[in-house]
């Protein structure tokens, strides 16, 4: 088979297994497939895997650090690893294109390499983590949905974020409340900065705005 797919909502909902081995022909882990599998500690990600669905591993105690996602994987769904409280390190493949809303929020991830080729980062994708530094690749100019990019990585630890050239807008609430943020570049291509994009960044002492910037939001 190719899919570990949901069945009436959740395939392995609250499953009581510690380790799972997926066969090499699995291409998709479906929505809520391992939702709150509260005893799950370890599983393999086959090289055939192309997508991880929404809420696939929501609130599971995965203890694979680093969590190595395979080359060939292109999409991580919304809330896929949200509330995985034991997760402290993730290695993304060079093939990843999309990271969904809150995909890694409320984890203990302290570092992540976002590869060139990544095209989209969802709303609160790294909210409430332990990230200290983030570099957004030049290929990634699309942030979030609805409240675009709000609280992209709101946490107590983020100190530095590097934004890509070609970015035209810093969205609403982008790094709002990142109280330890000391350094952020604003690319010369930025035209608009949204409301509360940098609100409550109390450790940020210096900013350079591009000459061509057209609007600066409130807060």
Predicted region positions:
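Short, charged, surface-exposed secondary-structure boundary motifs
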Residues: 144-146
């Amino acid at each position: 088979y190719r899919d570990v797919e949901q069945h009436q909502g959740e395939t392995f909902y609250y499953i009581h297994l510690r380790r799972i081995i997926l066969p090499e022909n699995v291409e998709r882990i479906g929505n809520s497939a391992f939702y709150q599998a509260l005893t799950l500690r370890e599983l393999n990600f086959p090289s055939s895997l192309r997508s991880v669905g929404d809420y696939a591993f929501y609130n599971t105690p995965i203890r694979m650090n680093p969590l190595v996602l395979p080359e060939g994987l292109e999409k991580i769904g919304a809330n896929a690893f949200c509330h995985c409280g034991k997760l402290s390190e993730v290695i993304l493949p060079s093939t990843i294109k999309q990271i969904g809303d809150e995909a890694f929020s409320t984890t203990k991830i302290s570092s992540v390499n976002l590869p060139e080729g990544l095209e989209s980062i969802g709303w609160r994708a790294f909210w409430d983590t332990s990230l200290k530094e983030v570099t957004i690749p030049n290929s990634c100019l699309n942030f979030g949905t609805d409240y675009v990019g709000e609280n992209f990585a709101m946490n107590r630890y983020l100190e530095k974020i590097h934004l890509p050239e070609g970015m035209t807008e810093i969205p609403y609430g982008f790094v709002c409340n990142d109280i330890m943020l000391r350094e952020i570049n604003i690319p010369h291509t930025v035209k608009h900065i949204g409301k509360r994009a940098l609100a409550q960044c109390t450790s940020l002492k210096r900013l350079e705005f591009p000459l061509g910037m057209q609007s600066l939001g409130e807060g």
